Amino acid sequence: VELAYDQLVSEGYIHSEPYRGYFACDVRELYDLTDIRSGEMKQKPFRTENNYGTAEAEGLHGKTGSNPKKQTSYEIDFSLNELSMDNFPYNGLSKIMKNLLLDHGKQIMSSGSAFGEKNLKETICDYLYHARNVRCTPEQIIIGAGNEYLQLMLIQMLGTSHGVAMESPTYLRAYRTFKNAGLSVREVALDDAGMRVDLLRKTDASIAYVMPSHQFPLGIVMPMKRRLELLNWAVEEPERYIIEDDYDSEFRYKGKPIPALQGIDRSGKVIYLGTFSKSIASSIRVSYMVLPEHLLERYQECCGFYACTVPNLMQQAICQFMQEGYFEKNLNRMRAIYKSKHDFMLAELKKYSWVREIMGENSGLHLLVEVDTDCSEQDVIEACTEQQIRVYGLSEYYISQNPKREYPILLLGYGGLTEEQIADGLQRIDGILAELKKYQPISVHKE
C-alpha cells in the first residue's frame, strides 16, 4: 500500500500533508481526443481552472567537460556518463552480428531505408508501448545516429524561425545543437515540478524542449498536473510543439517508471526522443524519434533524401538483441547493479557532516550534493582536481543565468565506479574539504 501511495505522489496524482494524510491533486481530463477531418487537425483547448505560470560528455559534463586543453589524469572520476559494462552480454551480441553477416551478408551490406529498418522500428514500437506508454506506429519512428542528428533533422523540418524554450540548468549538447543551427533559445527556470509554464508563456518560443521523466541534471520528475499545463500551452497555437527527451528514463529505483508525456498527448504535439546510449552502451550511438502522424509528410519532403546514419548491420543487430531477450535481461541486470551503487553512495554520503542535502535520488546515474563549505563551487572542483578526483558543479549546466546560492552543489555519478571507488572517492573529498580549512575533518561519522 505504501509503495502505491509513493507511486501516486511521484506522478503528481496525490500529495501528502504531515499528520493529515494523502489528498488528491486537482487533475482532470483537460482535453478531448483530436479530430482529423479533411486532413486538418482540430484542436480543443484543455479544460482547467488554473494555469501555472565525448560528444556525450560535453553535454553531461558541463561547459568545460571536453576541453582538450585541460587533459588531466584522474584516479577517480565521478563521471555522469560512464556505465558499468562488466556484465554486458558481449558473447550474445557477437553471436548475433556474426550470424547476420554469415546468413544475410549481401542484404546487410546494402543500403537500407532512409528512416530506419522496418523490423527494428516495429520492435522499438512494441518496446516503447509496454515500457514507456508511447503510442505510435512503426511508420512514425525515425532512426538516427544520436539525438543531436535527430534534433538537426527536426530543425530542418520545422525551420529556424522558431524560438526554443529550454530548461535551465539543462543538457548542454542539446542547447548547443539548437543554438548553432540558428534557433533562438529562451531559457526557462524550473521549480520542483519542472519547467515553469507561467514563464514559458512570457517567451516567444513555439517549441519547448523538456525532460519530464527525469530532468537532467536536477532529476526532477514532472507531475501530471504540470504535464497537462505544458500540453495546454502547446495546443493553443498550431505550430507549437514539445520535444520530449526521454533520456535516462530506464533507471528508476523506487516505484514504477513514469510514463512518457507522449502517451497522454492526443493532439499530436509531442515529438519523442529516445536513445540506447544508457540502456545498451554509449558507443552504440543509436537513437530514435517518434513524430506525430501529421508531421510525417512534412518530414518526408524536408528530410527524406537523407540516408539513415545508422549502419544496417547495427540496426539488425539491435533488433535481434531485443527480440531474443538480451536487451530486457541486460536492462534488468543493470537496474539492479545501479540501484545497488545508488543505495551504497547514498548511505556513504549520509556519513559525512559536509553533506547538507542530497537531491535527485531514486533514479538516473548520479546524485546532487549540497556541500557545507564557505568555498566556492569552483574552488572545491579545483581542489579535487589537484588530488586527481573529478567532480562536477551544477553551475556548469546553466545556459546563462546561474543563480547565486549559499552553498556549492556537486554532481556525483556512480554508474562507472565500483563501491570501493565510491567509498574511497568520498573519503578523499572529505579530506580535501578539510584541507580547505572550512570545517574540521571527520573522525567520527554522523549517527
Label each PLM-derived region with a short phrase.
Residues 168, 172-177, 241, 252, ...:
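A generic "structured core" feature
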Residues 2-98, 304-311, 322, 332, ...:
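N-terminal basic, amphipathic alpha-helical segments
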Residues 270-351, 357-361:
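PLP-dependent aminotransferase class I/II
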Residues 97-239, 250, 256-264, 338, ...:
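Conserved core of the PLP fold type I
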Residues 141, 240, 270, 355-356, ...:
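Short, conserved active-site loop motifs that form the nucleotide-linked donor/cofactor pocket
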Residues 257-276, 297-298, 410:
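Conserved active-site segment immediately N-terminal to the catalytic lysine
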